[in-house]
Amino acid sequence: VMHDGKFGYEHAFNSIDILNSNNKNLFIISNSSKRSKSSIDRLPKLGFKKNSFINTVTSGEMIWQLLKKKFLSDKNKKNCFHIYDEEKEDGLDFRDGLNFNFVEKVEEADLILACTPFVKLQPIDYIPLLEAAYNKEITMYCANPDFETVEINTNNNIFCMGAIGEIYKKMGGNVIIKGKPCLLYTSDAADEQDR
């Protein structure tokens, strides 16, 4: 773990300095639902130097790339129900470059893009939404496989989209998840080194 959400840990700074001084190639592999560029741009705010790392690969980026490749055509544009935290300023940025009609009701959707939980909803509150999706056989693309994280200000455990994806999977729903410990992460990072 490199940071607490606000600033980097001392052990992370020290380790990175030692590895950089020994000419080691460093990659960040993260289960963040954010795109990689967004995570890279955030590094200085956390106290890290961007040039300390060769690349950053996030689960969010892997899902975005998958959706971009899978739904290229303007023909029969798909309806997407997007689950995201409306209070986060970059919540809608994930949509940039994706070729979907974004809809407000899951019943109108062809797929679900699950990035970050809606504000003030608990896992149980998703059951009606997931039941409606299951009845329509809608696939969920989950951009964060983590089940929970620690809230910075309160130190409370809060759930992540991976928990909602797991509920949907146990209901019988189809869930596509990318992230650690998926082997594609390491190959994506290695591909970047070869470029």
Outline where the language-model segments fall:
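Asp-based phosphoryl-transfer active-site loop
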Residues: 1-5
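Glycine/Thr-rich beta-alpha phosphate-binding loop at enzyme active sites
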Residues: 143-184
